[in-house]
Amino acid sequence: VPKVSDGSLIHIIQIAEGCLGACTFCCTRFARGPLNSYPIKDIVAEAKKAIDDGAVEIQLTAQDTAAFGYDSGEKLSDLIKEVANLDGEFRVRVGMMHPKNILNNVDEIIDAIKHPKVYNFIHLPVQTGSNKVLSEMRRGHTLDQYLDIVSKFKSEIPDLTLAVDIIVGYPTESDEDFQLTVDLLRNIKPSLIHLSKYQHRKGAVSSSLKEIPHEVMKKRSRNLSRIKTEITEEENKELVGSVQNAVVVEVGSKGGF
């Protein structure tokens, strides 16, 4: 059921409920149930109403936007284009995509995100740079497949903003596995890195595993936080002196934008 717009500049639309994943560290599929994608026509109608009411940013969100349409036969790429083609001055932001669910249609999604009204942004969680740990997490893809997706996006969208998720200290993560994660981040240089320390979740498969020592986890987290800062500073320095377009979505805490 479309939500009633409250006149906010940012309007968030949930495009699906549920998940197709089987990640060992997660309980989403238990809490949210099987995938249920909402009809494109309903999502577009909600977006149009929000834009008419003054929204300048439409956020398409789900537990995994890349799974959209796997149950209904519709496509995420078609949804993005239909929303972006609405009249008005606004931008579309696409939420988190599980890598395994865009392997077969990455070119179509890239084409949709290249639309001038869509942010050059993807949130593509990888969690680890180790193939061994990826397999133990049951992520459903390899590191090479992930790198291929990132490479395709960056070759087609040179100014891409890449956001990634990393879990620090998964129970089976060795020092060598952690170093592979460090190597991955230095290689792909994501604009945004969301770090989280592993913790057991009730009902998750991985909760039966022995956690690594807390001090080891903290040390690895500090290491990645430092790398995160280095990558951000390097990217920001490259923007010095450039002119960028911006969308104003809120008033700052000190009265600015």
PLM region descriptions:
Residues R32-G33, S135-H141, S207-P213:
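Short glycine-enriched, charge-decorated loop/helix-capping segments at active-site entrances
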Residues Q199-H200, S208-F257:
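Terminal RNA-binding accessory module
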Residues D52-D175:
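Conserved SAM/AdoMet-binding glycine-rich loop
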Residues A31, Q63-T65, Y198:
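Short, ordered loop/turn segments at secondary-structure junctions
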Residues E173, L185-P190:
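Contiguous mid-protein beta-loop-alpha structural module that forms a pocket-lining wall or clamp
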